[in-house]
Amino acid sequence: MFKLTTKFHVFVFLFLGIFAFSQEKKQFPNVSGLLQRIIPNMKIDSWLLIHKSYGKDNVLKQVGRVKDYTSPSSGFNIGIAEEDEFYYIVYSAGGKTEYVTNPEELKKFIGKADDVQEAAVLAAADGYIIDEEFKDMAGNYSEDKSNYYLDLGKLTSKECPYQKKHYTLTVNKVSGIITEVKDNGAYIELYNKKCTNNPRLLKIEKKEEPKDDPKKKPSRSRR
């Protein structure tokens, strides 16, 4: 009986340990590191992943040799980027040089998500972001036997307020499809001085509203 009880306790302990491990949240690498892990879902001869910042190209990953390509003037981003900063992919297939410069082309290049990193990149191509400054909120994931659970952000308003919300996306491991999206609310909400809808200013204005003086009762004249 003692041996049976001991075995049962060990089984429960191991089960809970495996469950806790599967639910443990892990942070994604930075955006450039995440993009370097993607694998093309098409037959290509060679390809380059390039980060372009202020007109300067920086090759982040090279598979084979791509000849005779021109640096484009625009590309894609999957995080919060500077104004003159983007990524692009150049690949060679069937003797032709092709480019990936927008989210739709990026999704086609990756195809179905083969792992959690590709799932995050595909979600970002649909408008979500990996927020490198707030990975605890919008740049981490957990998983179980059936699904990935991605905590990602989204820029929902650029001014009055500047707002970012974070979401939990459930991605099926087999299909690579997002099956559920949970809105966890705003984690960044900033108002500048020009915002007339700033809640704090509205509260101050409400407090400063002058109260109407009570009407003075007419004094009775003495006879």
Language-model-derived ranges and their functions:
Residues 1-25:
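Bacterial Sec-dependent N-terminal signal peptides
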Residues 25-132:
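Extended, low-hydrophobicity segments enriched in charged/polar residues
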Residues 81, 90-93, 100-101, 142-144, ...:
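A structural detector for beta-sheet-dominated domains
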Residues 118-167:
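Acidic, glycine-rich flexible loop segments
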Residues 162-181:
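A short, surface-exposed beta-strand/turn
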Residues 181-195:
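Short, solvent-exposed aromatic-acidic interface loops
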Residues 211-223:
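Long, low-complexity, intrinsically disordered segments
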